[in-house]
UniProtKB/Swiss-Prot annotation:
Name of this protein: Holliday junction branch migration complex subunit RuvB
Gene3D superfamilies found in the cross-reference section: 1.10.8.60, P-loop containing nucleotide triphosphate hydrolases (3.40.50.300), Winged helix-like DNA-binding domain superfamily/Winged helix DNA-binding domain (1.10.10.10)
Source organism per UniProt: Bacteroides thetaiotaomicron (strain ATCC 29148 / DSM 2079 / JCM 5827 / CCUG 10774 / NCTC 10582 / VPI-5482 / E50)
GO BP annotation list: DNA recombination; DNA repair
Domain notes: Has 3 domains, the large (RuvB-L) and small ATPase (RuvB-S) domains and the C-terminal head (RuvB-H) domain. The head domain binds DNA, while the ATPase domains jointly bind ATP, ADP or are empty depending on the state of the subunit in the translocation cycle. During a single DNA translocation step the structure of each domain remains the same, but their relative positions change.
């Protein structure tokens, strides 16, 4: 069977798949699997805020994509018993956009801003007073007739999510009273998440099949659930409708996702560094140009997992692949070094 290069991270969900995605999201801390330390701390912070009848301190959630930042934000609102509004940094283009969202919040509501590192500087400055003093100052008119009007806001909790916390300005970061980092999930927890999702989707899934999918899910629940949906398709068309180990392996191989969870782009990154740059070191921008990919996407989406799993490392001079990458790709590290010294 011809392999399909399926980039699970860039796959665009249909509206129906988005409904499935929402149906799979836990709605309470009790149902949320993984991130034990983060969840335990949030339980305490949320309970304390409820006992005081106050808005929860502003929360910053950071970590790689797909680890549950949006889900946790929704759970925070559910546990507080307040409203939940969602927006993102790129959408808030002007101060007026931010003002419209902030003035619509009821007391103690949760406002979730995804990709908060992508806020424009002018919008970010308006956010400072909103976070600290629950007010914003809006300029009316222009020129000599311009004047500032102060608008009081209801107390609220801002939950900011970012995959690139290093891009946050120091003043914005300092205004978050709660700062939490999300880690990759281990395979056992991912396997439990997959079995829970399979139950919600009403598709039988064996323990071993769930473990097989989990092992190729890059420690990421979003990827695990996306792979589950695709394996379910294969089970319905090529199998009996149930997901067992055999159909799971068949589907994942057809999707060109290897036993480490690496997909076509991951392997292209490693091959490019080896074949074109003799294993590195090489700069990120150079890698991106050679691949025709965005440097930010490589740094944010692909690189963290490759480094975590030991296929790549960062050095002061650039990115280098490791001996494990050579073994994984069936390449000879000695041959590469020999070529380097012969140049």
């Amino acid at each position: 069977m011809e392999q399909e290069d399926f980039n699970i991270r860039e796959h665009q969900l249909t509206s129906r798949e988005r409904d499935f995605e929402n149906a799979l999201r836990p709605l309470s801390f009790e149902d949320f699997s993984g991130q034990d330390k983060v969840v335990e701390n949030l339980r305490i912070f949320v309970k304390a805020a409820r006992l005081r009848g106050e808005a929860l301190d502003h929360v910053l959630l950071h970590g790689p994509p797909g680890l549950g930042k949006t889900t946790l934000s929704n759970i925070i609102a559910n546990e507080l018993g307040v409203g939940f509004k969602v927006t993102s940094g790129p959408v808030l283009d002007k101060p007026g956009d931010l003002a419209g969202v902030l003035t619509s919040l009821e007391p103690n509501d949760v406002l979730f801003i995804d990709e908060i590192h992508r806020l424009s500087p002018v919008v970010e400055e308006y956010l400072y007073s909103a976070m600290e003093d629950y007010r914003i100052d809006i300029m009316i008119d222009k020129g000599p007739s311009a004047r500032s009007i102060q608008i009081d806001l209801n107390p609220f909790t801002l939950v900011g999510a970012t995959t690139r916390s290093g891009l946050l300005t120091a003043p914005l970061r300092a205004r978050f009273g709660i700062n939490l980092h999300l880690e990759y999930y281990d395979d056992d927890i991912l396997s439990n998440i997959i079995r829970r999702s399979a139950s919600i989707l009403d598709v039988p899934c064996s323990v071993r099949a769930a473990s097989e999918i989990a092992s190729r899910s890059r420690g990421t629940p979003r990827i695990a659930n996306a792979l589950l949906r695709r394996v379910r398709d294969f089970a319905q068309v090529k199998g009996s409708g149930s997901i067992d180990t055999e159909i799971a392996q068949f589907a994942l191989e057809a999707l060109n996702i290897d036993k480490y969870g690496l997909d076509e782009i991951d392997n292209k990154i490693l091959c490019t560094i080896i074949d074109k740059f003799k294993g590195g070191p090489v700069g990120l921008t150079t890698i991106a140009t050679a691949l025709g990919e965005d440097a930010g996407t490589i740094e944010e989406v692909y690189e963290p997992f490759l480094i975590k799993e030991g296929f790549m490392k960062r050095t002061p001079r650039g990115r280098e692949v490791t001996e494990l990458a050579y073994k994984h790709l069936g390449r000879s590290l000695y041959s590469s070094q020999k070529t380097l010294f012969n140049d």
